[in-house]
Curated annotation (Swiss-Prot):
Gene Ontology MF annotations: ATP binding; DNA binding; DNA ligase (ATP) activity; metal ion binding
GO BP terms: cell division; DNA biosynthetic process; DNA recombination; DNA repair; lagging strand elongation
Family: Belongs to the ATP-dependent DNA ligase family.
Database matches in CDD domains: Adenylation_DNA_ligase_Arch_LigB, OBF_DNA_ligase_Arch_LigB
Quaternary structure annotation from Swiss-Prot or TrEMBL: Monomer.
InterPro entries: ATP-dep_DNA_ligase (IPR050191), DNA_ligae_ATP-dep_bac/arc (IPR022865), DNA_ligase_ATP-dep (IPR000977), DNA_ligase_ATP-dep_C (IPR012309), DNA_ligase_ATP-dep_cent (IPR012310), DNA_ligase_ATP-dep_CS (IPR016059), DNA_ligase_ATP-dep_N (IPR012308), DNA_ligase_N_sf (IPR036599)
Species the sequence originates in: Thermococcus kodakarensis (strain ATCC BAA-918 / JCM 12380 / KOD1) (Pyrococcus kodakaraensis (strain KOD1))
Name assigned to this protein: DNA ligase
Active site: 249
Thermoactivity: Still active at 100 degrees Celsius. Thermostable.
Enzyme class: ligase
Catalytic activity: ATP + (deoxyribonucleotide)n-3'-hydroxyl + 5'-phospho-(deoxyribonucleotide)m = (deoxyribonucleotide)n+m + AMP + diphosphate; NAD(+) + (deoxyribonucleotide)n-3'-hydroxyl + 5'-phospho-(deoxyribonucleotide)m = (deoxyribonucleotide)n+m + AMP + beta-nicotinamide D-nucleotide
Protein purpose: DNA ligase that seals nicks in double-stranded DNA during DNA replication, DNA recombination and DNA repair. Can also use NAD, but less efficiently than ATP.
Amino acid sequence: MRYSELADLYRRLEKTTLKTLKTKFVADFLKKTPDELLEIVPYLILGKVFPDWDERELGVGEKLLIKAVSMATGVPEKEIEDSVRDTGDLGESVALAIKKKKQKSFFSQPLTIKRVYDTFVKIAEAQGEGSQDRKMKYLANLFMDAEPEEGKYLARTVLGTMRTGVAEGILRDAIAEAFRVKPELVERAYMLTSDFGYVAKIAKLEGNEGLSKVRIQIGKPIRPMLAQNAASVKDALIEMGGEAAFEIKYDGARVQVHKDGDKVIVYSRRLENVTRSIPEVIEAIKAALKPEKAIVEGELVAVGENGRPRPFQYVLRRFRRKYNIDEMIEKIPLELNLFDVMFVDGESLIETKFIDRRNKLEEIVKESEKIKLAEQLITKKVEEAEAFYRRALELGHEGLMAKRLDSIYEPGNRGKKWLKIKPTMENLDLVIIGAEWGEGRRAHLLGSFLVAAYDPHSGEFLPVGKVGSGFTDEDLVEFTKMLKPYIVRQEGKFVEIEPKFVIEVTYQEIQKSPKYKSGFALRFPRYVALREDKSPEEADTIERVAELYELQERFKAKK
């Protein structure tokens, strides 16, 4: 199958904003995709090469890409760099460079999807001395044989800046439409395996029956079950039917642990493989988990010298560190607090009641200095739960989780079986959807960011304010570099940005406002932190903003 067919799909997807049309385009493409390509094409459609949980990365930045294009086309690097400044899109500039290429090689071959994918695998696996040169040559060979439009989308895939507007929901519906299977079965299979390639192949070859038989697999992370918010401990108890398991809500990074004999893999909340960054935790897990095979879930917390938890950003610093890890082990010690188990020695436990899963967890974990069970209180009494809540806050934790004793584990679902209880005017996690260029010495930097809450019903991101304070000069440099590849359009000083990044924002209060489509505006919003552990769809919802507004107004009325 030729790569030009995939490039044409990208072009058509880019031209429409209609989700129904995007779904149809993707479904039609999947129908004609050969079986042997069906496990890789869904990722390429998403603008990726590998699933998020796959450790492999291309490791190619703009500079190396420009060198490869220059080598392939004969267009000087400086000319390509100048073109990028004009177009604002390296993909467009690559297409222009290929158009300028004097002639094709006598041995030129049309690009196929298999060749492109196999080359990407070689690039990802190139390690050690001379690996950058090898990566550049592999890329140059692709660009030598690429047509301008193919080159544009190759470059965007390499840099992860596809801009076609296809996310997981569209791909899920397209798989269902293409192979005439139930969307809910596609969703279920994906939630259990986080692997669209595998799900697409099962859907085509085995249909609804095959999808319904999909099971948890060690080495493929399960989408985490999520919680809704509760206004108070009392409200949580009422919602739970009068009795609940309350657990400390740790201020850390949620992780999923897969153990298979001596092999342990740890995935972050966004399902990225973070195993290499936490070797001391891996060794502690091997000693603590008794079964041969298991999947458990917990919160990884950074511990300060006084034994109190440090902000979760410290854990993210550990995840990002690729070198001098031993130094970081000493600087930022970690502790894993386990709170759930989904799989033990061939048996899936997701249909098992929470109370029984917790009992199983206690049975299979040998606690140690680094591996502990999440502290828990099962009670019917509001006073007991409130005392536990106060204690959690005094210890420096975020609050409490409340869980129904009979709740099954529902991958990817944000329901009321689990509730989180935190102080009323908590910070919000919001998505950057726009920004403005600064003035004077900051004219080359983005300096004010339009942030939005997620509307799960429409899939839209609804703006709730502009955040311009709380950033250091270094933050603005980093944010500009990070966001530039995702600029969709510019109007004067304002740029629209593809929703990719979540930031934590504090504020004085929430106001009703006709200024924004959401109907709300944050008063005096201030940047707190980048939430690299959250995807845009995991940001706070517009319902949560409305809930906080109501709580705030009730609190004012009591004064």
